[in-house]
C-alpha cells in the first residue's frame, strides 16, 4: 500500500511541477510580448515627435535618465531620448508626469529642438474622464497639436496657460483641470530642458541599465 501512495504522490508532485513550469513559460512569453509592443509603440511615437530628417541616430539607443521632481512631476527618473545629426544633438524627447490631472497622473512625452521649439507632444498614459479629459489623447482629439511650434520665453510666460487663465491654450468644455495640468507639465519640461541642455547632453546613456 505504501509504494502506490508514494508513487501517486510523486506523480502528483511531478504534474504540479510541470504545470507550474508551463504557466511560468506562458507568463514570460506574455511579458516579453507586452514589452515588445510597448517598445514598438514608443518608437512610433518618437518618430512622430522628432522627424527622421532631423536626425541620423536610433532614438531609443540614445536614452538618458533625468531626475527633477519640480520639472518632471515625479520622484522617479524619467527617460529622455536624444536625437543627433552627425554626432551633434539636435532635439530631445522627454517623458514627464502631470501629477495634478483630474483623475491622477498623466504621463506624456515632449519633443523639443535644441532651439527650444516644441516639436510635438503625445500622451502616453492617463485616467482622465472619457468624453471630457481624454481629449489629451491624439486618438480622441488634436488638442495636443496646439503645442507644435511653441517656444517658452520665460518661466512666467503668460502664453503658457489655458485661455480661461489668460493664456493661449484651449480648455475643454466642462473640463479645465486636465488641460491646465497638461499645459503646466509641458511648460515645466520645456523650461527644464532650455536651462539644462549642456548638462543633459553630458549624462550617461543609462536607460537600459535602469530597466534591468
UniProtKB/Swiss-Prot annotation:
Enzyme class, UniProt record, top EC level: translocase
Predominant subcellular localization, coarse grouping: membrane
The molecular function terms of the Gene Ontology recorded here are:
electron transfer activity; FMN binding
E.C. number: 7.-.-.-
Its Gene Ontology cellular component terms are: plasma membrane
Q: Which domain of life is it from?
A: Bacteria
UniProt cofactor(s): FMN
Annotated compartments? Cell inner membrane
Please name the GO terms of the biological process aspect recorded for this protein, alphabetically: electron transport chain
Q: Could you tell me which residues carry FMN phosphoryl threonine? A: 176
Alphabetical list of InterPro entries matching this protein: FMN-bd, Ion_transpt_RnfG/RsxG
Protein keywords? Cell inner membrane, Cell membrane, Electron transport, Flavoprotein, FMN, Membrane, Phosphoprotein, Translocase, Transmembrane, Transmembrane helix, Transport
Topology in the membrane?
Single-pass membrane protein
Q: List residues traversing the bilayer.
A: 9-29
Fetch the Pfam families from UniProt: FMN_bind
UniProt similarity note: Belongs to the RnfG family.
SUBUNIT field: The complex is composed of six subunits: RnfA, RnfB, RnfC, RnfD, RnfE and RnfG.
Q: What does this protein do?
A: Part of a membrane-bound complex that couples electron transfer with translocation of ions across the membrane.
- Name of the protein this chain belongs to: Ion-translocating oxidoreductase complex subunit G
Q: Which organism is it from?
A: Shewanella baltica (strain OS223)
Lineage of source species: Bacteria, Pseudomonadati, Pseudomonadota, Gammaproteobacteria, Alteromonadales
State the encoding gene. rnfG
Amino acid at each position: 500500500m505504501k509504494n502506490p501512495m508514494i508513487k501517486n504522490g510523486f506523480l502528483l508532485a511531478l504534474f504540479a511541477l510541470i504545470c507550474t513550469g508551463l504557466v511560468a513559460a506562458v507568463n514570460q512569453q506574455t511579458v516579453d510580448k507586452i514589452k515588445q509592443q510597448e517598445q514598438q509603440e514608443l518608437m512610433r511615437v518618437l518618430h512622430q515627435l522628432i522627424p527622421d530628417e532631423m536626425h541620423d541616430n536610433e532614438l531609443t539607443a540614445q536614452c538618458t535618465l533625468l531626475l527633477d521632481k519640480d520639472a518632471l512631476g515625479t520622484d522617479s527618473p524619467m527617460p529622455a531620448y536624444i536625437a543627433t545629426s552627425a554626432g551633434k544633438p539636435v532635439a530631445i524627447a522627454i517623458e514627464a508626469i502631470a501629477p495634478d490631472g483630474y483623475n491622477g497622473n498623466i504621463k506624456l512625452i515632449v519633443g523639443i529642438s535644441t532651439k527650444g521649439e516644441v516639436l510635438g507632444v503625445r500622451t502616453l498614459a492617463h485616467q482622465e474622464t472619457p468624453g471630457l479629459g481624454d481629449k489629451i489623447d491624439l486618438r480622441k482629439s488634436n488638442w495636443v497639436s496646439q503645442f507644435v511650434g511653441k517656444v517658452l520665453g520665460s518661466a512666467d510666460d503668460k502664453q503658457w496657460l489655458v485661455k480661461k487663465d489668460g493664456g493661449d491654450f484651449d480648455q475643454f468644455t466642462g473640463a479645465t483641470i486636465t488641460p491646465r495640468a497638461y499645459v503646466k507639465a509641458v511648460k515645466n519640461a520645456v523650461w527644464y530642458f532650455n536651462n539644462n541642455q549642456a548638462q543633459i547632453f553630458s549624462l550617461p546613456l543609462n536607460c537600459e541599465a535602469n530597466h534591468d
